[in-house]
Amino acid sequence: MKYDPPYWFWDSNIPISVCDSIIEYGKSFESEQATVGYGEQGRIDPNIRKSKVFFFENIHWINGITNQYCALANTSAWNFEISGQQSPQYTIYRPGEFYDFHSDDSTFAPVMRKLSVSINLSDPNTYEGGQFEMNLGEGPFVLEEMNRQGTVIVFPSDTQHRVTPVTKGVRYSLVNWFEGPAFK
């Protein structure tokens, strides 16, 4: 489905100190191999996705950050009916790691993922590669601002997007999904 606008973003809006705090906080937990699919159908597939993840369960200050940006973008752009928020995912991409084109939407009743929030936590001087790209119908679209630390993007969850392989260093991101009743 095409949306107008296809995404909403804030360039380097989250302070570096907050990004660094989230990175350090995330490092205090044990991450696991990322999977593709959802819930019970989740599986490891290194041809599609290779990274480590950890879910921040009930970390209110982190939930508040992603919630704020989702609400602002949704009110400004789409006005989707949102009824809940999943746990934010802290993602670590090391050299050779990536996530190929995919969408975040889920169609599991009674709610579905409607909006995705992605935040680049990393200083762009600490990694190479790891480009966030979207498929808006004309092939890969690169939003260069997503390379900057603290940049936030919100987009409809059925939008195809990917992170290209990191070639050097480590890229950290925070992703969150907001859900609601099925579209009518």
For each feature predicted by the language model, list its residue ranges.
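Non-heme Fe(II)/2-oxoglutarate
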Residues: 1-83
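Catalytic core of non-heme Fe(II) oxygenases with the double-stranded beta-helix
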Residues: 67, 71-184
